[in-house]
């Protein structure tokens, strides 16, 4: 079976009737008949009233919700006494709806990966609330509480080389979740591995090979196949294409889009590359110093960002046109051990006012978006 041909990030109108899972303006190619034939059926407290209605007004089922989510890291004793606590995630409220991709962007150290790890139970949260499929997860929930949710929420790591055991054949690695679940015979497990490898565009004969025999893009396909083994409903993709070159990034992004259309998946897509997030997301949340500063539909946020930090992020992206203006965000991200009293972006903001220095801005609903800024 030949390797899946190289794909390009798709632009332009390629079909007249986009699927309900597509981002605004996205026009992807339909799946092949073979891909459609082998598809796996998808598996079927502090918030203001106006914000709650905003989150639910589109009618889609919300399958992930966080309210005022906080994660603190205890760094030990202060020299002057007391505990030294780093707040990596500060009162983050997000939703992910069935069949959509939420892009989570921000600079390094903004808390993106920490949020993703809390949503799959790799890290406990300190305070706030996490609800998955309507079930509340306690801050330090035991493994038994997570067990019925494990197969429904899976994680795709940034470095596929580190995510795979170098001494384990890839077929065995893909089958590992099936072994843990323990509900398939050996023949059924082998058939499922073959199905998963075909699903991500790899020949089934590769199952006997070891990870070092594959390229970075092929290894990431293997990691995705393993994540799909138990028919999850949500994939948390933590910088899933950051370690790949541009051509491989395009292939993996298109693979994730195809899988979403075919299996009805929801994605939390964590990245710092704004171009990739724009290609794959339906909605985008912008994170700064552990706090959400703006969320909204992808098209609206990219065309007219409301928060000064969102604007600065987009303006800092290099453009291919010669002589195109490019602005660089002045200053550095504040230390999470000593954040400003008011708005965390205030020391770097060109539109800062006196109130910004003293009063943290609440997250306000502005049309179909939310923004934390005193300008609104």
From Swiss-Prot:
Matching InterPro entries: AAA+_ATPase, ABC_transp_ATP-bind, ABC_transporter-like_ATP-bd, ABC_transporter-like_CS, Oligopep_ABC_C, P-loop_NTPase
Membrane topology: Peripheral membrane protein
Superkingdom: Bacteria
EC category name: translocase
Subcellular location: Cell inner membrane
Pfam families associated with the record: ABC_tran (PF00005), oligo_HPY (PF08352)
Region described as Disordered: 1-25
Gene3D superfamilies: P-loop containing nucleotide triphosphate hydrolases
Predominant location category: membrane
GO biological-process terms attached to the record: peptide transport; protein transport; transmembrane transport
Keywords associated with the record: ATP-binding, Cell inner membrane, Cell membrane, Membrane, Nucleotide-binding, Peptide transport, Protein transport, Translocase, Transport
GO cellular component term of the entry, any: plasma membrane
EC number: 7.4.2.-
Binding site for ATP: 106-113
Domain ABC transporter span(s) in chain numbering: 64-314
GO-annotated molecular function: ATP binding; ATP hydrolysis activity
Subunit structure, interactors included: The complex is composed of two ATP-binding proteins (BMEII0205 and BMEII0206), two transmembrane proteins (BMEII0207/BMEII0208 and BMEII0209) and a solute-binding protein (BMEII0210).
Functional description taken from the UniProt entry: Probably part of an ABC transporter complex that could be involved in peptide import. Probably responsible for energy coupling to the transport system.
Similarity-based family: Belongs to the ABC transporter superfamily.
NCBIfam families linked: oligo_HPY
Protein name: Putative peptide import ATP-binding protein BMEII0205
Organism field: Brucella melitensis biotype 1 (strain ATCC 23456 / CCUG 17765 / NCTC 10094 / 16M)
